[in-house]
């Protein structure tokens, strides 16, 4: 009996210690990664309710190597979702499907995260390449300014000790979102403490739902390495609304503006490297709408520097920016972003002439479905049926010189012209023949797209992931993006509308896609057009 009482006493002591550890709260939860968890993560309702549903604005995730990541928390369909910043955390730690994450709440809105692989073994992370960032966190912890590694849809770089950049991290992306139409519009963001960005080690912030192609990213990174800014720069890809006269405007990231721009509507100063002229646009701030806009004399900056759609403006705060709000603006031209040599930085602001690149591969990244189980419908967001355009390809023998989708049919004259063209190419790969339909030449950019057939994809080994595809025609290039739908369908979406518009394609025209090269980050195809008048 005495032994039994002793055991009970020890058990009570253990229980008491455990209760003290919990501090009366539910401190931990576990999430297993699924295919839908890469862009967003749903917090368990039971855990959120235990805290009275008090998770909004942002939280901080502390990774096993000590880096702090600021992640936006939003409410959607009565669910609490980790969104902006989450993908950067996932990418930085190479988190994969079936990995498990243990979140432990160590203080208000701050979580320690342990990461386990699919075998339930803890992943080990090194601080190599981000030593400066780790050091900054330790030094600044006493002043309550935590270093952050903010996130975006596009890839970025973290400084290491030698000033180079690591591909493991993401560029900050806490900007006002832009709609798929390409127009800027402010999005609602909860307030972030200014210290979160002020001590950030990220070299630049990229607007949310914007994407840098490999060409663009190389040029931006080269510029950042060259100028070595002491503070985080803001990278803006020019949209139609940013450069369209008579009243262009530019939306500034809410979180970036909180740190580097004034907290009220005032005039700011813009300057160009090696130029004496200054511009004084009006910085317009409206707190209730989380809206931060440059307007007014912004039009003069656009006109004087001949800023065009798809150009990239890199805003770097000057040393005294917190007092006089002055920014040096470096301009990367569209043509320069795709040039094969040099840094591509237009320092003098002079015109580079007509560009041979019609699109800088800017992508409007859409929010992924919140529900862990994706709702499959007969039509996707772009109005395209989830049912593939082809069940199998037709035309010709087992290894045909060209491939036509089974739902498309060539007339006798069309077939003759196509075969003559294909013979002249002498391509090692089958040529894809696409007869333009209404969905391929839509005036609306969000609905204009082209599917690449499954058999063609297999013949030229198209990747099963999103990929930049450069289209060539008559010495000019257009950057498009191939996206994956329903797991196997490959659609040219972003940039395809511009190709259609610039080449004046219409229903009934025929495009022949000749596969050229497949590098790691991009595909290149030559496109030969046969206009419908030629087949009459």
UniProtKB/Swiss-Prot annotation:
Keywords: DNA-binding, Nucleus, Repeat, Transcription, Transcription regulation
SMART domains: B3
UniProt DNA-binding region: 26-119, 235-335, 435-529
GO terms assigned for molecular function: DNA binding
SUPFAM superfamilies registered for this protein in UniProt: DNA-binding pseudobarrel domain
Entries under Gene3D superfamilies matching the protein: DNA-binding pseudobarrel domain (2.40.330.10)
Span list, region Disordered: 141-201, 363-405
Gene Ontology, cellular component aspect: nucleus
Pfam families: B3 (PF02362)
Chain intervals with Acidic residues compositional bias: 386-395
Location of this chain's protein in the cell: Nucleus
Domain of life assignment: Eukaryota
Coiled coil segments of this chain: none
CDD domains per UniProt: B3_DNA (cd10017)
The UniProt record lists the keyword Metal-binding: no
InterPro entries documented for this protein: B3_DNA-bd (IPR003340), DNA-bd_pseudobarrel_sf (IPR015300), REM16-like (IPR044837)
PANTHER family the record matches: B3 DOMAIN-CONTAINING PROTEIN OS03G0619800, B3 DOMAIN-CONTAINING PROTEIN OS11G0197600-RELATED
Protein name: B3 domain-containing protein Os03g0619600
Organism listed in the record: Oryza sativa subsp. japonica
Lineage of the organism: Eukaryota, Viridiplantae, Streptophyta, Embryophyta, Tracheophyta
